[in-house]
């Protein structure tokens, strides 16, 4: 839980961490188990703030039902070479929405960059003069049923969902600096059932994806190899597992089964 400061910054007031149940690869399989997980985590976080209740919830979502693509759109300024205003910009962004199926919903439309009369590299064209405005946008879409179920299960705890956010974007906001986004960076967040990826270029998300493989698959593989029960294997993995950075040049071909990438 957090409070928004006077300059828009977040001040963390409390956190609640509980073991997740009822979700498989980003999809709800047992709504009651998920509801109990959400309730328990919120109760734990509220211990830090007393009797106060959150005014709203921003929930991150993952899962292979989420897809993304980059689109381009252009629109002429009706004022010819007049100032570009926010109304024209909103019209431009709405036009960048791709055609979605009956069970699909647009989650995010994030401008990557604008062009005004052929001039590239513009972050915010509002107030500039120009007759033709173009945008390249990163669009994230998801299964509308899955997204609605996510909102439904959270709101059964009497909390109000203000917005759903792509999990990898939330991870990036929590871990990256502005300079890292500008230089170019990849965020890889390995969860239990999925791995979430987002690529930043010149300060904006350029690519995002969800891979249906996570830590749970590693636990199962270890369980088979070690011939130990799943719960014991998970404990061993968490307690003793490490990831050691190794230079690519120090790897031998046979160590990667000739699959060098």
Residue ranges and their predicted role:
Residues 183, 193-197, 218:
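Extended, hydrophobic alpha-helical segments in both membrane/secreted and soluble proteins
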Residues 192, 255:
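Short, glycine/acidic-enriched loop or turn micro-motifs at the edges of active sites
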Residues 3-187, 204-206, 215, 226-252, ...:
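Nucleotide/phosphate-binding catalytic cleft detector across ATP-hydrolyzing
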Residues 1-2, 196-199:
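Short beta-strand scaffold segments in enzyme catalytic cores
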